[in-house]
Amino acid sequence: MSENRKDQHIRYALEQSSSYNSFDEIELIHRSLPLVDLAEIDLTTHFAGRDWEFPFYINAMTGGSKRAKEINQKLAAVAEACGRLFVTGSYSAGLKDPNDQSYAVKKDHPHLLLATNIGIDKEPDLGLRTVEELHPLFLQVHVNLMQELLMPEGERSFHTWKDHLKSYGQG
């Protein structure tokens, strides 16, 4: 995917405007008499070999362009300052261009809890290369058929996806 396409994705996300908010679908029911003490509530989650204080992280956003690098650096700074996990966007562009620095956030944020992701269409050896290059806590494998179908340059061959997922799960 070209740098222009990555920037186009950013532009679409920024231009998207909607009055819909999924939080509007949540109805909080007032309970005057609580059944538990606040100290009894524990949001700790065990995931990826770690205990997380609460299940909140910055999920895969972008990568693969100069603008994406700026966004990733800002998100990484916030995540590091707050002790939250940051997941980079799909490393596909980084695999194509060894000079792409948009994913290289650890050098400026050494205490960052980092993960990255890769598309299921990528061979598992490319996933291993991604891990070797970025040293994330884990590799997230994304499956996004609709995105592939909507992008003119998107993947059109899906017969390997199931085997790839099985290999990623064993690796």
Model-derived regions: residue spans:
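Short N-terminal helix-initiation segments at or just after the protein's N-terminus
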Residues: 1-5, 21-27, 52-61, 79-82, ...
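Alpha/beta enzyme core
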Residues: 76-81, 108-109, 113-114, 121-171
